[in-house]
Amino acid sequence: WSSDVCSSDLNLRAPSVIGIDTHVGGVMGVDAYYGRRAEILESWKKDIRELAKCQNVVVKLGGIGMCSFGFGFHDRDYPPTSEEVAEAWRIYVEPCIEAFGVDRCMFESNFPPDKQTCGYTECWNAFKIIAKNATATEKKALFSGTAARVYKLIAP
């Protein structure tokens, strides 16, 4: 993640090319960013809203299990539950969905890197928990439809 949103200029100049923002923008929560989540989150939300103005950009909702996000689950003696993961990740997933809409968002597992935080099952269950109030159409977009369209795949 970068506060200058430099990629948006490129996306505006090449509107026929689909830009993919991975890992919700790769927000850092360690090293120099540790303990500054609230400050960084507000700046990141502003940048996400700006990037979402580029109609050719989609965002992958995942990769949040990497240690660089700074949730600290990897430091515990026991793994987090799906509910704990959902609660932690929600602060990044929901603003992306609000800014981009479900037709420009797709859940991603990012395994094995996300394995640093939680298991594969907990990851996908966390996404289901986050999306529990979405309509069936919205869930289809988030879990398969957007990815199928962007990557030109045949969705079930």
PLM region spans:
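Short, small-residue-biased leader/transition segments that mark boundaries at the very start
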Residues: W1-S7
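Generic detector of well-ordered alpha-helical packing
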Residues: V5, V24, S109-F111
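Short, catalytically relevant binding-site loops at active-site mouths
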Residues: C6, G25-G29, G65-S68
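N-terminal cationic-hydrophobic initiation segments that often serve targeting/anchoring roles
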Residues: D9-R13, A52, I97-E98, A131
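Non-cysteine beta-strand/loop elements that form the S-adenosyl-L-methionine
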Residues: G19-G25, V57-L61
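Beta/alpha (TIM)-barrel catalytic core signal, keyed to glycine-rich beta->alpha loops juxtaposed to Asp/Glu
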Residues: D21-E39
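Active-site-adjacent C-terminal substructures of enzyme catalytic domains
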Residues: G35-T117
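Mid-to-C-terminal alpha-helical segments outside catalytic/metal-binding sites
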Residues: I91-P95, A99-M106, P113-P156
